[in-house]
From Swiss-Prot:
Presence of keyword Cell cycle: no
Record-level GO BP terms: translation
Protein name from the UniProt record: Small ribosomal subunit protein eS12
Family: Belongs to the eukaryotic ribosomal protein eS12 family.
Entry-linked InterPro entries: Ribosomal_eL30-like_sf (IPR029064), Ribosomal_eL8/eL30/eS12/Gad45 (IPR004038), Ribosomal_eS12 (IPR000530), Ribosomal_eS12_CS (IPR047860)
Naturally occurring in which organism (per UniProt): Oreochromis niloticus
Cellular-component GO terms for this entry: ribonucleoprotein complex; ribosome
Keyword Membrane among record annotations: no
Molecular function terms, GO-annotated: structural constituent of ribosome
Pfam families: Ribosomal_L7Ae (PF01248)
Keywords from the UniProt entry: Ribonucleoprotein, Ribosomal protein
Length: 132
């Protein structure tokens, strides 16, 4: 738990790198949130990375996304909560204290453009290299 709060100083793991990669991609307009946008990006082979919420309530969404990722050899990461994923990709309002509120759940998001090189991006890429 201690390393989670200090990604700049210590070694970054996938769970701390993923939100950072998604935020950077959001800033550089490189995200395709939602099943329709994600499916289009996956089908056109524009995706570098796909993130799927494990608590997605529609099993056919999960099947479609997993099949497209497998067919086009696109890396897939599953996160446990669609509200958390929605917050990471900017589907929320930020209040005065900087806390997210009115978070909308997001079942699937595709990273089409990482935006810029970063340590977080390298951590994600190393994670997939080690899985192969």
């Amino acid at each position: 738990m201690a390393e989670e709060g200090s990604p700049a100083g210590g070694v970054m793991d996938v769970n701390t790198a993923l939100p950072e990669v998604l935020k950077t991609a959001l800033i550089h307009d490189g995200l395709a949130p939602g099943i329709r946008e994600a499916a289009k990006a996956l089908d056109k082979r524009q995706a570098h990375l796909c993130v799927l919420a494990a608590n997605c309530d529609e099993p056919m969404y999960v099947k479609l996304v997993e099949a497209l990722c497998a067919e086009h050899q696109i890396n897939l990461i599953k996160v446990d909560d669609n509200k958390k994923l929605g917050e990471w990709v900017g589907l929320c309002k930020i209040d005065r204290e900087g806390k997210p509120r009115k978070v909308v759940g997001c079942s699937c998001v595709v990273v089409k453009d990482y935006g810029k090189e970063s340590q977080a991006k390298d951590v994600i890429e190393e994670y997939f290299k080690s899985k192969k």
